[in-house]
Amino acid sequence: MTPSLFPRRAALRPIALAASLALLPALALAQAAEPKDANDTLNLNRVVVTGTATSASKMKQSVSISTLEADQILKLSPTNAAEILRSIPGIRSESSGGEGNANLTVRGLPISAGGARYVQFQEDGLPILLFGDIAFGTADQFLRTDYNLSHLEVIRGGSASTLASNSPGGLVNFISKTGEEKGGAAGLTLGVDGGRQTRVDLDYGGSLGNGTRFHIGGFQRVGEGDRKTGFNAASGGQIKANITQDIGSGYLRLSLKALDDKTPSFLPVPVITTNGRIQSIAGVDPRTAFFINNSTPQDLVFGADGKMVSTNPRDGLRVKSTAIGLEGSFKLGDGWNITDKFRHSTNSGRFIALFPADNGTPVAGASKFTATLFNTSIDDLGNTVNDLKISKTFGNAAGGKATVTAGLFTAKQQVALTWFWNQYSVDMKGSGAGATFTTAGWDTWGGCCVRNYNVAYETTAPYAALTWEAGALTLDASVRNDKQKASGFYQEDNPIAKTWDPATRKNVNYQLSHTSYSLGGNYQLNKDLALFARASDGVAFSADRLLYGTPVDGSVPVASNGVKQIEGGAKLRAGAFSVFATLFSAETRESNYEATTQKFTSNKYRADGLELEVGYRAGDFKLTGGATYTNARITASNDASTVGKTPRRQADFVFQLAPTYAIGALELGAAVIGTGKAWGDDANTIVQPAFTVLNAFANYQFNDRLSLSASANNLTNTLGYTEVEGDGHAARAINGRSVKLGLKYNF
């Protein structure tokens, strides 16, 4: 069944909907999100709230932070959250997997098994999921960007380790509109090259009077997705809404979210690796290949309740999420402030994607390959989170001021999934491939992957921060104590009886704690130049990655993943030119389990580098960009042969350039994203070649309300590999060229 959050007529007749909306009377013009100072191309004057104890401008904060406005993001029609983040310096974001299950990290911290272990995804200051690397259940799966988005704040390193849990690498905060500006927009987007798709976006917000304001918006789409799949692989939508009541010097806010969506997932495809070089196989283009189609049979799997379930591989990544949030913030007088944020979310779904178990070898020119269908039920990834913060500001006779902050973060995250992976013989064809069932999940890969687990992770994290500001100097220190309690079970199957095996059921019952710290300072030499430095220590606790290995019943110590960082840099505005430069060094220790290789690892890493973010404006021409140089090494490992090697998929150099030029009512722009050569494995035997991707857009403004746009992702159809299996039989690449046309009406 096609998921739907809007009336069926809206899903089937988006053009009629857009046309009717265009006839609405003009209520207000949508105000473009431009900085007040047109030359402040990096928006260094924007006040940021993410991962900081006190609200202050980017120029005054002692952290590396980037911001993106909604209009910057929407112009290039990004296909997923990971693609948005590729434009942020210091972020390594692999956007090749579709609208979820992305791999992401910062500043040379490792991507050892997938997801975003060291980076927390947030919506409006609270985590979407408490852990960033849950197998088949990453935070970006439950995140969609649409017209509800106000702006994006991204912190690398810094105080992220003490002002949020499981985020020593950084924070990515998607901040919603709250009705402060009256108006809205309706948009229609059509996919015309690449995958066929139709999408309708709508939002509106404003004042209801008496200090009450609201915002509501969402999207509905149907189509193939970002590759030609031959069926409606992408179908669904989202609604978000909030209402705010201003009360004296504070406010109360209620927010709601409903997401019901399915999208295709893109996993590695069969390739051949010769002398460390990846080569595609005839008939299988890694940029476009998709082996699931209308002829793919239903997949019969074993459920958590012990019953067989018939599933449809064409559902791909199917997610459902509902959330309700409450937020309040008040100034109590005499320097006292209190803020509390609460959210309860239910998250569930199913992940289905085809992974090559081989590449058809040893027979040269093989017409078929063996595929494992990763079919994982996301039974429950719901959570309840609350962040309470109280602060007091003290002045002194010397004109300085100190702010003391105390907070308490609490969370309960459920992690309940069921795996059952059948195998198929699949035609070696990038489209229209036939698939024949061969092996039931009871026997796939030796029966390793019939799994069921249900674990509750409870986190209690008190934290405190002290900020002292005297003239041009700001100093801050913060500390956080994360305590995690895990309880539940995990079990495997009895392949003979074909049921869950009580003998394999293991209890989960352990506790962990870690105290993190962060010390920083910022000195503003003048209004256009500031220097900053910081040292921090943080932790990322693991969840399901610890199961099916060392006992987690409390009988032996449980490992955690730690990061120590130092950084220092400068922020400069010089006329039309702006630069944000940071030197960094990070040490990481981690333990890990990887589903595709069935291996446990224990490694230590070090990464040193330089991060640059620049901006320039000359009349109607604007350029923003960045570059990151990283020297990363494995410094210790349970596999001694990898010590001294470069961590897999870590390029020494990556860069981003985004020029735009306005010619009257026409605006032209591009995003050039490049990555240097990387190794595909920790042994450094397989090369992932360097590649550069060109995205482009054109936007024509007919009048103050109506605009027409065209955007292209991977305009030159570049082949760029983002990962390869350690034995070289399969690799994943970015999507090939896709082109979209959009019509937007502001009202």
Task: Please name every model-derived segment.
Residues 182, 211-214, 249-254, 336-338, ...:
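Repeated loop/turn-to-beta-strand initiation elements of outer-membrane beta-barrel proteins
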Residues 1-87, 324, 605, 616, ...:
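N-terminal Sec signal peptide and the immediately downstream disordered periplasmic leader
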Residues 244-246, 251-323, 350-376, 429-450, ...:
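Acidic/polar loop-and-plug regions of large Gram-negative outer-membrane beta-barrel proteins
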Residues 381, 399-413, 448-588, 607, ...:
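Structural signature of Gram-negative outer-membrane beta-barrels, strongest in the C-terminal barrel
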Residues 472, 576-589, 594, 600-683, ...:
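Gram-negative outer-membrane beta-barrel transporters
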Residues 171-207, 217-229, 671:
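Short strand-turn segments of transmembrane beta-barrel domains in outer membranes
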Residues 127-156:
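Short acidic/polar hinge/loop motifs at secondary-structure boundaries
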Residues 82-127:
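Extracytoplasmic beta-strand/coil segments of soluble accessory domains associated
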